[in-house]
Amino acid sequence: GGIPKFVVDGDSRILSELYENILYRDVIKRFKPHLEKPIKEVSLYFLSTVAKRCSFRNISVATEIKNIATVKSIADTFEKAFLFFFIPKFDFSLQKQLQNPRKGYCVDNGFVTQVGFRFSEDRGRLLENVVFIELKRTKKEIYYFSGKGECDFVLRVGSKITDAIQVTWELNENNR
């Protein structure tokens, strides 16, 4: 695959080309041709905001996609292509889970660093993305929590919360 080739060669174009191939083959071809540009914009948005909350309503406002259902459909297609994943906010109310923004993660940090729009390394968000990908392999239900405090990941198996995980690049008094 292309990702190991990037590690060996170090050529950032390899990751960009691989990302474009996945985007066209697994996402864009499933939609009408006029949505190609907006899908690329949504993709860039997700890459640039990895490990941050995202609202489908805000994405529809920022792009040419005026129908929120279309934005949701694009996000679902990204998930089916194993390119992006979205987790809900933990709440005991399903309605509140559905109403709150989701946090998005990318299958590979190489795509985030090579294709995404960034001004800094933002190691904390990249680390959180790596932790998410590893947690995804556990097959547990993954949520984030925000309320009186925040927690990057809340894991659930059946009706039991099994873990709460906070990811941080640097631990200090402000983020304990």
What are these regions (language model features)?
Residues 57-61:
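A short acidic, leucine-rich amphipathic alpha-helix
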Residues 29-34, 62, 89, 93:
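C-terminal helical "lid" subdomain and adjoining coupling/linker elements of P-loop NTPases
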Residues 44-48, 64, 136:
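Short, locally clustered residues in the helix-turn-helix/winged-helix DNA-binding domain
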Residues 65-80:
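Short amphipathic alpha-helical interaction segments
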Residues 1-53:
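Interdomain motor-coupling "hinge/lid" segment immediately C-terminal to the ATP-binding subdomain
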Residues 9, 62, 69:
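Phosphate-coordinating catalytic segments in nucleotide- and nucleic-acid-processing enzymes
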Residues 76-176:
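A cross-kingdom feature that marks ATP-driven nucleic-acid transaction machinery
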Residues 15, 35, 70, 123-128:
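Hydrophobic (often cysteine-bearing) scaffold residues that line and stabilize catalytic clefts
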